[in-house]
Structures are given as C-alpha cells and as structure tokens.
Amino acid sequence: MDVETQEIRQARQRASVKWLLSKAFNNRVPDNLKEPFYRDHENQERLKPQIIVELGNATLYCQTLANLYSDPNYQSMNHWSIIQTLARKGVPVAESADMPITETVLIQTNPLRINAHMSVIESLMVLYAKEISSGDRVMAAIRRISGNNYQAPTGQSYEQALLGWISHACAALKKRIIKEVDAGLPDDNGSRLQTPDIPPVRDFQDLCDGICLALLISYYCPKVVPWTSVRINYLPAVEDSIHNILLVCNFSQKHLPYTVMHMTPEDVTYMRGSMKLNLVVLLTDLFNLFEIHPAKCVCYPGMDGQVPHSNSFGGGLNRRSTPPNEYQTVQSNNFDGNHAEAFVVHKSRGITTLASMHSQQQQQLHQQQQHQQQYHQQPLQQHPSQSQLQIQQQEPLVPARLRQAKEKTNVESKADERGRRSRRNSSSEDSQLTIENFGGSQDQLNTLGRYERDRERKLSNTSVGSYPVEPAVAVRSSIADARGTLQLGYDTDSGSEKQDRETEKYSMRRQVSVDNVPTVSSHNLSNAGSPLPVARHKQHSSDKDYSSNSGMTPDAYNDSRSTSGYDPESTPVRKSSTSSMPASPAAWQLDVGDDDMRSLENASKLSTIRMKLEEKRRRIEQDKRKIEMALLRHQEKEDLESCPDVMKWETMSNESKRTPDMDPVDLDKYQQSIAIMNMNLQDIQQDIHRLATQQSQMQAQHLQAQQLMQAQQIANMLNQAYNAPVSAYSSRPPSRDPYQQQLHHQQQQPMPMPQPMQYVNEHGQYMSPPQPAHYMPQQAQQPQSIYSDNGAAYNHSNHSPYGGTPQYRSSVVYDDYGQPTNHFYLHESSPQPQAHQHPQRRTWAHSAAAAAYEQQQQIQPSLVDVNAWQTQQHQKQKQTWMNRPPSSAGAPSPGSFMLHQNGGGGGGGGGGGELQHLFQVQASPQHGQRQVSGSNGVQRQQSLTNLRDNRSPKAPQNMGMPMGMPMQQEDMMAPQSICFIGDEEDVDELERNIIESMQSTHISDFVHQQQQQHQHQQQLQQQQRLQGHSGRGSSSEDYDSGEMISNKLNITSGNLTYRIPSPSRPSIQANSFQDPRAMAAASGGEDQPPEKGFYISFDDEQPKRPKPPLRAKRSPKKESPPGSRDSVDNQATLKRESLSHLHNNNNIGFGNDDVNSKPVTRHSIHGLNNSNSVKSPGNATYNKYTDEPPIQLRQLAVSGAMSPTSNERHHLDDVSNQSPQQTQQPMSPTRLQQSSNNAEAAKNKALVIGADSTNLDPESVDEMERRKEKIMLLSLQRRQQQEEAKARKEIEASQKREKEREKEEERARKKEEQMARRAAILEQHRLKKAIEEAEREGKTLDRPDLHVKLQSHSSTSTTPRLRQQRTTRPRPKTIHVDDASVDISEASSISSRGKKGSSSNLTGYGQLSSNSMKRDYYRGSQDSLTVKESPDDYPSTSSTPIGRRGSYKTSREPAGVERGRTLSRISVAKGSTLNFRGRKSNSLMNLCGPKLYKQPAAKSNRGIILNAVEYCVFPGVVNREAKQKVLEKIARSEAKHFLVLFRDAGCQFRALYSYQPETDQVTKLYGTGPSQVEEVMFDKFFKYNSGGKCFSQVHTKHLTVTIDAFTIHNSLWQGKRVQLPSKKDMALVI
C-alpha cells in the first residue's frame, strides 16, 4: 500500500465512504451526499463538511451498526466503543505505526485523519461481509444453485465463500446456457448461440474483467442482464472489462432497490488488488439482494430444471410468478424454510428444535402432498408450519434467507443457547449479530432492544399508532433499508441482534428488516414469545416444548408454533387479511367457548358501545395500516417484493395491498392521514378505556358478588375479550402488534382467533389485549388446556410465547380496554383515561395491560378458583412443566390460569404472565414490564429480582416442581416493579447490598423457602389483590423480572426509560428480605396445597392510585427494589434475592402471587387496600419509593399453611411463573446459584415485601405522597444549593480575574510612563545632537521649529511605539511615516516619498561621507539617518508608522549587516547591543542605550544595490558584461539612491534608475525602460536582503527610500496590451 498512488487512494476512499453512507442511511443516501467529495478552488478533492463532522462524531459508524444489527443501542456510541465493538465481533481495526487508531485521532475534523477513518470503515466493511455471508447462508445458496449437497471446506473464509458462490452461479449459468444452445435458441440477431468460455473464479483479481460479475447478475436476473450482453473474450481487453462492469453498474442503479456499486468501472478494472475489500462488499450486497432479500428483478429460471411453481415456496423466490397472496402467505408461513436445512444456521431463521425438525421431517412428505392444496386453500391463514414444511419440500429453491436460523434448528433450549451465545466469539455464526456481543445478555438485549425498537419504531413511524402496521423499522427507515442491512434474521423488535426470539419476528411483524426474514419459524414462536421477557425465557424452554409438541403431530407442531406465534412477532404475521384475525373469533371461542359473556352481562351496554368504538377504531386502524403500507411501498417499491416477509405480511394484513406499488400516495398525504388517524385512534382509545374502566368497575362489583362463579365468568370474559379484542386485533394487523403475534399462528386453528382488541395507545401504538393461547388447537386438544382450567388452554397457550396465558390474555385484553379499577393499572392510573398515561408514554403494553386489566376484572369474577387451578396447575404443571414452553411459565398450565391471579393477583401464575406477556409483547418486554408494574411508577424492584430469578434457569424450580408452586415462586415473567429499578448503579448497588446482607444473615438459605411460602401467601393475597388490582399485578408479574433484566431492563416509566442492564444478576428472592426464620416458617406453608379460594376483593373504591409522577421522579437511588421502596433505606439490607422475592411480592410477586402482593402493593397501592396481604409483623421495610407506608416484609407464609390463598398464590406463581422458566432457562452461574436458591426459595419464597393491601389506607398513601414530596423537595434543595455554590464560585473566580486584570493594567501603565519618560529624554538628546551636528557642518536647520516638532512628534508617536519595543524585530519592510513625522523635517524625513527629508545629509555618528562607497557597501555603517528613522519614531523595528511589522527574515539585511537606516531603530529596540559593522557610532550607542537623535543624512542605498547587482541581479559568468556596465554606471553616478527596474515579479533586470527623494524623480541611468518613471507607473516594489541575497516584495503604494527595485505595469511594456474581455464573452446584464 505504500506504493499506491494518490489516484488509487482517492478511488478507494470514495468507494468506501459511499458504501458507509449507504449503510448509515439505510441505503437511502440524501441527494446532497450521494457524491461525498467535491472539488475546491484548487481542484483538490475534499470530503464534504457534513460527512467530516459525522465521521468526527461517529454518527455514521453508529448508524451503520444500528442498521446492520437493527439495534438502536448502537446509536449512541463513541469511536472507542465502536472500535471495541468491532474487535468483539472479530474484526479488529487495523492500526499502523504512523497512524494509531484512537478516539483522539478519529475525533479530529480539522484536518480529518482520513487514513484512520478508512481503517474503521474497512473494518465495518469486513464485519458487514462476514455477517451477511456468515454461517451456512452462502453454503445453502450454493447447494440450491448447484443442486448437490455442497459442503463448504472447513476454515473457509467469508471471502472464499463469496467467491465460491459466484463460481457456482457461473457454473450453473453455463449449464443453463448449454441447454439453451442445445435447444438451438437463436440470439437476438438470429445467429446461433455459442457456449461461452466462462473463466474460473479463483480470487478477486478474476472479477476485475467484469465477466463473472455480469454473469452472476445474468444468472439471477436473466431478463435484465441477458448473458449474451456480456463480452467474454479469452484475453479480455480493457474496453470489454469496462463494458462488463458498466453492465453491473447500470444494473445496480436501475434494477436494484438501492445501488450497491460504489466504484467506477475503472476502479474495478485498473485498481485490482487495492479495491479488493470494496469488491467483497459489492458481492456481499449482491448476495443480500439475490439470496437473503431478493430484489424484484430476481428470478431463478431453470434452477437445474426445477422451476418453482408459482405457488411453491420456490415461487417465493420466483417472486414474479407467485401471486402475491400465495407467495406471501407461504413465506410468512414458511419460516422454517427448507426442512432439509433444518440444521443449517441462518441468522435469519428461528431455532429449530430437534423435535420440531423431527416433526417437520415426518410431516414433510405429507405437507408436500398438500403443498399446493394448502397454498390455495389457506393462502392467508396457512399455518407457518405447513407452509414451512411445504417450503421445505422445495428446499433446493429456497433462498438462503428462507432457511431456518441456526437457532431454529438448534436443539439447545433458548436459554442454554443464550448463555452460550453470549460467550461466543462474535464472529461465530451464532452470536454474530447478538447484542450480547456488545456486552448484554441475550435476554436483556431482547427485551431491551425490542423495547427500544418498539419505541423507536413508534417514533420513527410516520404515525406512532401506525407502527404496528408496517412496523417502521426501528432505526431503519424502511424495509428496504432493513433489507439492505443485514437483517440476518434478527428481529428488530428484539434489541438483541439475535434476540432470543431468534425468530425474526414472524415476518408479519416486519418490525424491522429483520422481520423481513421469513426464516422466523414457529420455533421462533417461542422466540416470538420472547418478546415478553418472560415469554422469552419460558420460551426457551418452550422452544423445546414446542418442538416436542410439534414433533408429536404436525398440528401440534403448528399449533405450538401458532401459539408461539402469539409471539408479538408472529402475530404480526397475520396470515389473513387485516380482519382475518379478528374474523376468527372462533379461535378464541374454541378455548373460551364456555365462558359466555355472562361476566359482561352487567356491562352489556357498555360492551356494545365499546364494541362499536372498537369497530370504528379497527376501521381507522385498517385504513391507517393501508396508508402506512402504501407509504412503505411507496418508499421501497423495490424492496417490498424483495422482502418476502414484508410482502407476506402485507398480504396478510391487506390482500388489497399485495402490489408493492399499491397506491403510492405522497408522503405528506400519508403522514397527514396517519396523524389524523392516530388522533382519532387516541380519542377512541380513550373512550374505550373510559368505558372499560366503567365496565371493569361494574364487573368488579359483579365479581365480588360472583366470586364463586369465577370460572364461568372467566370463560365469559375470555369470550368477550376475544370478541372485543377481536375487533381490536382486527383493527390492528396482528403483525403490527409485535406482541400480538402471539396468536397469529394460533390463527392456524381452523378458526382464526379474533385477535383481542388491539389498543392503540395514546402513542398510537397498538396494544392488543393478550390473546388466549387457546387459539392453538393444541390447547383445545390438551385436556389440561381445558378451558375450565383456563390453565389448560394456557398450557397450550403457554407454548405461545406469552405462555399459555394467551387466553388470559384475552382476559388481559380487557386490560387493553382499560383495566378495571381493581386491576393493576398498567399505567399508574388505569382508571384514568389512557390519555393520562399518555404522558407516561403508554405503550401498547400499557393499553393492553389496561384492557387486559379490565378483562381480567371482568374475568376475575369468573376466575376459576385460582387455588383450584393452582392445584391443578400444580399437578399438571409438574406433569407438563417440563414440556411446557417457558412462556408457559408465565402462565403455567391451568395454574397459568392464575393469570388472573396475576391479572387479579399475579395474574395467577399464568394469567398474570399472560397479561404480562401481553403487555410485554405489546410494549417492549421491558416496556411492558415497566408499564405493567411500573405503570404506577412503583414497579417493584421485583423486576430486578425477577429478572435475576428469571435469569436463573431455576433449575431448582425443577426441585420445586413437585410443588409446582415453588417452582413458580418466581415468575420470570412476573412483572417487575420498575419503580425500584432506576439507574443501573442503583440496581447493582441494591443487589450487592442485598446479596451481602443475605450472606451475612444467611437469609439466602431461607430465602428460597420463605420466598416460596411467601409467594404462596402472596399469591393468595395477590389473588385478593388481583381482585383488587388484578390487572396490575398480572402485568407486573408477567413481566418476567428475569426478562426485564435480561432485557437489560429497559424500563419505560412514563416518559422515562430506565435501562438497567443486569443480565446476570442473581435474582433476588422475595425471601431474601425476609427474616430467615420467618422464611423457614413460611416454607412450611408452601407445601400446603393452595386453597381454591381465589379471593377477588374488588373494593368498590379503587385504591388510591399513587401519583403517576412517582415513577418518573426517583430519588437518587432511582428505583430501589420494589421490595424496598425503602430500599433506599433498606437497600443495604435487602438482598438481591430478597429483592427478587420482594419483587415477586411487590410486583405481584415474582411468583405470580409475589407479584400480586407486591405489585398490588405497589401498583395498586390503592388496590392493595383490598387485598389482604399477609404481613410478617416483624419485617417492616419501608420503601421510600412506594407510596405505601413502610412496607413490611411480610412473611406471608410464615406458617406454610399461612393462608391457603397465599399458598395457592404462591403455588400459582411458582408453578406458572417459575416452573417453565426453571426447566427451560439455562442457568448462568449466578442464575444457577440463585436458581438453586430460588428452587428452595421457590419453596420458601414467602417473603412479601410491600405494604399489605390492608395497610394501604389513604393515610399511608398520603404519607407516601408526602414522602415523595419530601424527597423531591430535598433533591430540589440539593440542586439549588449546588447551583448557589456554583454561582458563588463563579463570582469569586470573576473577582479574582478582575483583580489580576487591574494589576496587569497597573503594570502596563507604569511601563508606559517609564517609556514615555525615556522617550522624552531621548528626543531631547537627539535634538541636541542634531543641532550640534548641523553646527559642525555649518548647516542650519531648515525649520526653526524643528525642536518643537521633534519633541511633539516624538512624544506623540514614540510613546505608543515604545511599548512595542519588547517584541521588536530587525527592521520594518518599509519605512512609512505618518504625516506628523513627515513634517518633522522635510530635510531629514525619508519615509514618505512626497516629503523626503531635506537634502542635507546629516551624518551623525559616522564621519564618513554618507555616500562613501565603503560605507554604502556595508549598509551597516551608513549613518545618514533621517529624522524619521529615529528609534523614537520607530521604537520597535518592526512597527512603522503604518503599523507594519517587518520580520527579521524579510528585512533586507541580517542584523549584523543592517543598514544604517534601520540600525538606529534596531539598536533602540534591541537595546543597541547589536554590533553593526562599519558603524562607528555603535559603541556610542551601546553606551548610551537607546540611540540619540542625530540629524539624518539623506540615505544612500548604494551599497545595497552594489551587493544586489553583484550577487543577485546578474549572477554567474554569463551576465558578467551586463554586471560590469551597471557597476560602472553606479560608480559614475552621484545619486544617493538607486533603483532597479524588473520586468515582472520574476526579477529579470531591465534597467537601473536613480532616485531623488527630494524631488521624487526616478531617472533611467542604464537599460531598457521608460526614461522617467512617474508615480502612476509603479506596479510592485521590492527591497533587497543583502544577507539572503534576494529581493522581497514590499506591499506599499508609494516609493520610499527603503525601496530598492520596482516593476511597472504590464501595459507599459511595448507590444503588451491589457487583455480586455471580449464583448462576446461578457454576460448581458439587464
């Protein structure tokens, strides 16, 4: 590279910067940046300032990474973070010795260190290439192309893989060509085709002739670039090469959704090796657009004779041939891609479990047979699994992107994989895109990323509400962008690159480009479930479970997928038209069938109104979706087709939208209409919310009356939820609701389930109430799922990402609508119109929670005896626990039913979980979490602890399994109180403190037991509370704390998003805060079967809701663990585990019951009043952050039997939340440890920290509020004090500065006075000398008033100048005197040509005649100084009257040889220590200090001119004659001053002139030039530097004695005319 020319370097820089811009702007580069360089006035290429700035602040790098991984977390990194990220990804930035890559270097913008930035850009290019071509993607493509079972050589690099891809494509094309030739097809000219000799591709050098690049395009796009247009010669000429590469360029510009060719044809042809990386990136982009996200123009004709049927999945590839409907359906359904590829790792694909693979294999033939039939029969509703299987049949034709992601095929549970992945080398296939590589755990990343993504999506969408519709890609502006970037199957939703949901969101969701990857499969469902953090964990297990189920039967498999399809991701997929989901209320009904709407009977009118509103909202949403879809299409017409997922989901959402080009409306119109719709949706939502609240209140009363009938009522509620939700869902394309995806697959069931009503938050986000998992046929099939159990459905539902809870979800749906007052208010004030939450930033999770909340309330009356459920669950869970997908953990089997517990109390284990899921799904999991439990702002630390607990795989849960409940003790999905979660540091500190205290107190040992007990108690309490706050608890609980944390705890509370990355924190268990003894006691109760009484105590009065601000405003320890609202106080004490339990408790129990109690406590601080929490009198922890009075660490189950309710609740929690999680979650070391603790804790987890609902009386709420106000006041005071201290410091500093300035001025003033004094003395002395000299020479001064003038002049002009003496330099370039000085004595003044001093030659110190040759020669000896030159006049040599400073370098002579005229000045300035040769007065000057005045003699520059003529003007032997003549003329002349005339600035001698300063006459003595030169003729002036032997130009307008040479205007030379512009060229000025 050392040898590379500037041209090559510039070409590479241009191509690389263009590539960077395309990726940073998601392939939509602004027009003004399409060409990154511009040419400046010197014709130099410069990078545009905007790009320089964005390189300097790392914006472009951040955007590139964010788009590449669909992860907004990359948006705020600095250069160093980016370099570290690249290194973690296995692409270290190359440094050179001369250019280290550091933040300091990269941040520079003036000048920009382009080489350093090139290193970073090239590393990004390598990363991009690796990510796109990593794993088996390329291998799968090669297999499809070649038709054989190609196996990539081990150790093959991504570059070799890409070359192999091109090589195989060219070989396949050659086969095709041979067939054409054999068929005798003529070419365009009618002549017979001949088989071309396609050169082999061994390295990138072979691509430089453009043949293989063009043929590659011809292979994929034969209609656009026929192979006959490629010039193939054995010895390619440069012309042919450029022609071929031009084909590539034109194809890129005209036929691809965005240009990928950033090089010019010449770059490729000539640069060869130096452009290799740019070529690699070009191939990568082409691979992306041909294989991963095929562009419109891509078709695969005659893939080895296998032309995909239009309805075959291959047809998907052959996009053109497939009817959009079928194709899309197929694609959306075929997430798995080819079965054969089951073990192929594709980032874009979901994980396939062995079971699922097995089932797929078994089903493959069957499905193949049904393939076309199915496509036609259920183009829209087709089950993903079916379509997948079908697709699998045609695997050879499936583009690599359709293949399952490795994770899908992965046998390991998600949790296991997650644990593994985080440690994996970033370049490994698995982890490449995972955020974990960036330092987060997968879980965290998922929830977090998803949450943020959702948020961003919402923000980025033209309309917030519209977001779900065509999910705006988080960071990506569009699918195209998304597609352009690596959407390797990562969900945008999932913050993690790979999000556990691995499933790139069911394509439906198309959240981000990732969604586009169809690879998401049912397995992904489980992943989809992961949207809820809880769901995710559970899903990990559930993945396996699903796969097992799927293995059992195709239906089961599909169902499980469907269930998981509930996954927010999957829901979006929405196979049927927008209304299809809602249209299939049957699905809901399947599960809910029994529950008629009896529970709603009381609110039938409200329901009717609400239904109408929902219908209206649904229509608006549909319209909005259409518009958004159209907008997206408009933006990315090309991309849509290339992205099957998008197509899929668009078709699903709206068949009419099939054509990507569909109604391209102006962006403005789209945006306006969307904005209007959002407003309408918000209004409707608020109305619905209000209705829901009323309804829920009515229901709450009703429920109290009908607690015995809860089971039926629940069913009814579910039905209602289904129906109403259906409209909601229908209103929103399931796909839009990332979380709703859950049931999308469930639609697979014969009857698409109506999606619960989707709520559009104030933010316009769709909130879908949770949908019952029942959609899944499995649910129906499984007895456990029996609706009566609700849990049973849950069991199946559990498979759904959300856990079986989807059914509950339906109940949760109510939450969407508005949570009954008793339900937990997702938004701290559920009762308030959602608008109130709006400020908080209600996410759909909120809305969903609200709806679910309502539903739950409604359902609660019908809630089956939760305890009974729990018991059933307990048993079933034990049985099914292992099988149950982790998601089910949230809503364990029938136990899951506890959803309501959760919902009502913890939503029961499952119910709450479901709600949670719902919420989480709807919001980012984190969001949901926070919203759920944080809605009150008081989410408990629980989220933290839950997270931690959740995190732990909870192997111990298995231990607890028998108990089931204990297992559930921590509902991973349990919502966590986020209120406690504030800053990461706070959380960490809390956890540390808690852990330490636990260790010190040995509480941890008991914590598990107690926690479990506690949980049981709490569950009971929660149930009660749930009744009071069911909605809230459930949502909180549902939030798997683990999930939350795993999700990095992005907690959104209101407008605040707290990101708490605590991926591996040990979970705090509720017990941790408990007294160990109490815990032990509690543990006993745990075993007791939960009683079947589900206490739903809905007080008519809604508990006072803590002020919403609570959440937003946190004291420095921002959210202490929920358990310790006090935690500020308690933090040290509370242990992390405890916290978990606390959280569970606080947040409606980690276990659901924990969550119930706590969230209830917290959430509903108001609601808590209703619930009976068991308090352990002894432990009173006071959470500052909770509204409640000091929370008492309740040992809910001090006696195991403590209260059946608590046991039940505990049981439910444990079972529903914990078991699945435990079994499924892989344990991180911490987790294992904790898990074991948790397992025990699960048993013992009885500790409930939180104010009992009974405790929460209005006074305590007031007290809490007062406390909050107090805290706020304190913080305000602190802030004020800080500001005052800051102000004081500033004032002091300014005073100090003032004093220093005054001192400085004083010093300067004294100096000036001293100088003035010295100047006055000097002037007097000078005057005296001048008079003496004049008398000596017998001359009289020309002007009698010379003295006065001199004095006045010196006093006026010297003083200021003297100040500059300090910095004096040799002599000024010119001596120019102001008028005052000129007047001093015309005789002596030489500075102004018009008033040259008197002709009298005042010789001061020197006795030599002023024009003596010797003295002239050594200018230094010159003593004829005019008055003007007096040091006083120019005390600083460098400053002349006009203020110009002559630098020593530019002065004509070195100091030693300074001419007399400057000498005096210099000597004064320098202290006259310089020894000037030939100057007799030097010694005198040295003695005197400053040189005294002497009557200046007319100066002569004779010596200078002689020197110039000798050494400069006529150098060398050639000019000897001319030199002699000039020297003679000078010798003969009597003139004192000589000037040389030059032709121009080149200093070519033309003539010698004499100058009379007195008369300003310039007369020619010798040479060529005008005989007399007038002032107007002068052009430039020069003076001679006798030391440097050169002339330097003097920028002055007048001739003075300091000038030694000049030029005259060009026009004066004969034959030269000034070039006037021709009139023709002149612009006509009108």
Swiss-Prot record:
Sequence ranges assigned to domain CKK in this UniProt record: 1489-1623
Single GO MF descriptor: spectrin binding
Gene3D superfamilies named in the record: CKK domain
Protein's UniProt keywords contain Hydrolase: no
Residue ranges constituting the Calponin-homology (CH) domain according to the UniProt record: 156-288
Region (Disordered): 311-333, 355-446, 486-589, 726-753, 872-967, 1005-1042, 1055-1186, 1200-1241, 1284-1315, 1335-1459
Biased composition (Polar residues): 319-333, 432-446, 513-529, 919-947, 1065-1074, 1167-1184, 1401-1412
Residue pairs linked by disulfide bridges in the UniProt entry: none
Keywords, alphabetical: Cell cycle, Coiled coil, Cytoplasm, Cytoskeleton, Microtubule, Phosphoprotein
Family matches, as Pfam families: CAMSAP_CC1, CAMSAP_CH, CAMSAP_CKK
Residues annotated with Phosphoserine modification: 422, 431, 441, 460, 463, 466, 494, 496, 513, 530, 1034-1036, 1067, 1219, 1228, 1398-1400
UniProt feature coiled coil, ranges: 601-639, 1277-1343
Chain intervals with Gly residues compositional bias: 902-914
Residue ranges, compositional bias (Basic and acidic residues): 404-419, 495-507, 1335-1348, 1450-1459
Regions of compositional bias (Low complexity) in chain numbering: 358-394, 576-587, 738-750, 872-896, 956-967, 1008-1036, 1218-1230, 1382-1400
GO cellular component term, pick one: anterior cell cortex
Major subcellular site: cytoplasm
Entry-annotated residues carrying Phosphothreonine: 322, 492
Family membership noted in the UniProt record: Belongs to the CAMSAP1 family.
Domain notes: The CKK domain binds microtubules.
Oligomer and partners: Interacts with msps. Associates with the minus end of the microtubules.
Protein name, UniProt field: Patronin
Gene source species: Drosophila melanogaster
